[in-house]
Amino acid sequence: MSSQPSKALETFDNPTPGRDFHIHMEIPEFTCLCPKTGQPDFAVLYLDYIPDQKCVELKSLKLYIWSFRDEGCFHEAVTNQILDDLVVATDPKFMRLTAKFYVRGGIFTNVVAEHRKPGWQPQPRVELAEFESQSNIRG
């Protein structure tokens, strides 16, 4: 696998496709460029999903996220593009991408985009776990 930015998302087979389970990822180093000014934008991405048959492979996700660093993107557009690409790659039962952009012009922007597979219903009383934000060091 390459160590260069790439739009290719790789997957692997869900090890337990008969069970709904929640995958939570925090991606603290997302960058892209403001399409108006060319200035860098920074965000923390939170990816939550319930896989069906496929899970996203982490290194390919890292390289995919890295591929946006030199692209001009509006916050709303890039959040939805990333979600759409992940949905195409993994076809999850449920996926939510939350993008928390750092302040620009005195305004913090948060964008939340969701996908539900047609016909999928969560089990009764299932709530996705809340995770505290993690630093790069786990204790």
Curated annotation (Swiss-Prot):
Gene3D superfamilies: 3.30.1130.10
Annotated GO biological process: queuosine biosynthetic process; tRNA modification
GO CC entries: cytoplasm
Annotated substrate binding sites: V56, E57, L58, H75, E76
EC number, UniProt record: 1.7.1.13
Gene Ontology molecular functions: preQ1 synthase activity
Cell location: Cytoplasm
Keywords, in A-Z order: Cytoplasm, NADP, Oxidoreductase, Queuosine biosynthesis
Catalysed conversion reaction: 7-aminomethyl-7-carbaguanine + 2 NADP(+) = 7-cyano-7-deazaguanine + 2 NADPH + 3 H(+)
InterPro entries, alphabetized: GTP-CH-I_C/QueF (IPR043133), NADPH_dep_7-cyano-7-deazaG_red (IPR050084), QueF (IPR029500), QueF_type1 (IPR016856)
Pathway connected to this protein: tRNA modification; tRNA-queuosine biosynthesis
Active site positions: C34 (thioimide intermediate), D41 (proton donor)
Signal peptide: none
Main location per the UniProt record: cytoplasm
Enzyme kind, highest EC tier: oxidoreductase
The keyword Transit peptide is assigned to this record: no
Keyword Oxidoreductase: yes
Similarity field: Belongs to the GTP cyclohydrolase I family. QueF type 1 subfamily.
HAMAP family: QueF_type1 (MF_00818)
Function: Catalyzes the NADPH-dependent reduction of 7-cyano-7-deazaguanine (preQ0) to 7-aminomethyl-7-deazaguanine (preQ1).
Full protein name: NADPH-dependent 7-cyano-7-deazaguanine reductase
Designated gene of the protein: queF
